[in-house]
């Protein structure tokens, strides 16, 4: 079998997710063809699929040593840096790939995703629109453009491009889920009828059927057929849970470790003045009202709503891994705190924030409140809480874009909520004056009073 046929066979196995087989065959083929840039790039892509980031980067770089103008390898290396939150290096590489080939659609798409991460949505939209002029029937470009418009509240454009996605690829169900957010369904709605057919379509894989189940749950709820709504919510959650690897004990043990780390820390005696930067962290359980609080505060002329930033979590978890045996060293060594603080500031400095006060709305930052106090003593922390049953049910009936894996099984969701509640109580005992707690229901029922109190806590003038 010649190399072309071997690669074709390998790509077929890659497409069905048989990555162990692909790695074995690619290593063998690459050994026989050590100067083949394409093989090194494909090997790197396969390592990415099995989450071996280091090996992926090595092979992408080897591919580029063999062929510095291999735009696919440049693009893949840029994606790896982007996923590792090294946005500066990722941007440099995307620009390099597009310099070699200005019409490289994958590069335009991935660079647009980086721009969205950096809250530069207008530039992301420009990149996607350019890509669509090159490949007008590329359904992923239309879907990505719809998501970009969604992030800036242009819902008419979102729906238009989601519908175009399905026109090109009727089986791409994430577009169904996106459309469902903007329709108040009736039983004769054509999209509703389409989804009822699609759920029994054997050509649609389980990952896509998850999206249809959640969309149908919302549709049946709109129509008022609650038994069917619950059925599809249950099916969607069960199917999603079967497709992910997750152990609730990992999260619970992490929260226990955090409490142990901070148990004997007296913040009144420890002067962690590492950074004088002012910023706002809005946190709590997902679906507790954090988005509403962010919308209110980011409408202020001096506040920049940065969305859910991954930076703090990644920086702290990296230090956890490096200090597994003596986690308290993270706190007790000033140099560690300075490195972590600088890393966060460096990441947020890339955002297009016009020198405004940055608001980080990652709900799960409740895990890191003690770290925030140590790293940024002038920060403002707002904890949003909501009725536990309402919070958990809202989590359960929503499909999340990010990895909130505890939300797809009722028992795991309850265990996570209890651990969250315990940790928040711990932080309130330790750092009561540092945390402003607000109830979602109070904000809804008495907005004027609560908005004024929020602004006062953040030291912002009423506008």
Q: What annotation goes with each model-predicted range?
A:
Residues 225-340:
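PAPS-dependent sulfotransferase catalytic core
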Residues 11, 38-49, 72-83, 105-117, ...:
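Conserved alpha-helical positions within TPR/SEL1-like repeat arrays
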Residues 15, 49, 83, 117-118, ...:
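Register position in tetratricopeptide repeats
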Residues 152, 166, 303-306, 311-334, ...:
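PAPS-dependent sulfotransferase catalytic domain
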